[in-house]
Amino acid sequence: MPVTLATFENSFVTFDDQSNKFVSDRSCGYQRDFCIPVYDGTDVSFLFTITADRTYVSPEDFTTVNARPTCEQPTIMFSNPTVIFTGVTSTDGDGNTVHYMKCYWPTPFTELQGRHGDCFVLRVVFDDGDENFVTACTNCFSYIPDKCFTTQLKYMSPDDIMGFPYSKYRFEVDWNIIRLPMWLSKPQYPKTGEYYERSNGTKQTLFARIERQYSVISDDMPEWWMKNLNIALSHDDVYVLPEDTAMSEIKVVATNDFEIQWPEMGTNAANWGRPVFELLETPFVEINNNCS
């Protein structure tokens, strides 16, 4: 059988037909281009599979190329030898070997400096050792010169959830990592508590709990980004690295409210909007308990 590459449902990085990802439009309505922002290579880590009738596959080529609707005759921007592919093998119901792979970069995209706004895709070529090659390109990315008004999102779960077969992987850490045009804002410190009133009218705190909660502000996103963002926030382990370099990585839990603000465009259809949600920092709990 030919070698095939596939990303998982609900992944921000896909090997789908680029024509329906680079331009997120419909047959009627407004047209918008959406490319995932990337500041350096550490902003991208994704999972995918390689299926073949052999147990051997190897990466023959990895390049960053100009964004096009297809992978044919690309203009190579640079080859990146620092990319790392790791994986484990399994067998599907038809006896084919399935390689569960992770792709990530341990170093920055230094070659992209000075290319502010350039759109590009990641192009990979794999060989099964018998001159059966497969070439695939991802959806598009856009280089940004700084991290302002963006946030790196990192998420994983120990079990299979929402289209991600995490149990197939045996890596030490199987993170999905992506950078999105959103940022943390307006921290609040909601408090819950219980009190009782003495006979003389004074009040005594029985229990008080204070948490830190962020509102998230975002730029426009296509519908499939917002769907995948909601799924990412539903994972067991979710971390955000805000654009503020003074802040460190924060583990968060999303509240149950995730809404989308759609643009007011009359009868014109649009499949982009802005997600509205809040994140609770964890662990961040200040407790006063006089009940014990």
Placement of each model-derived feature along the sequence:
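Preference for solvent-exposed, low-hydrophobicity sequence contexts
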Residues: M1-L153, D160
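Extracellular/virion structural assembly segments
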Residues: C137-S292
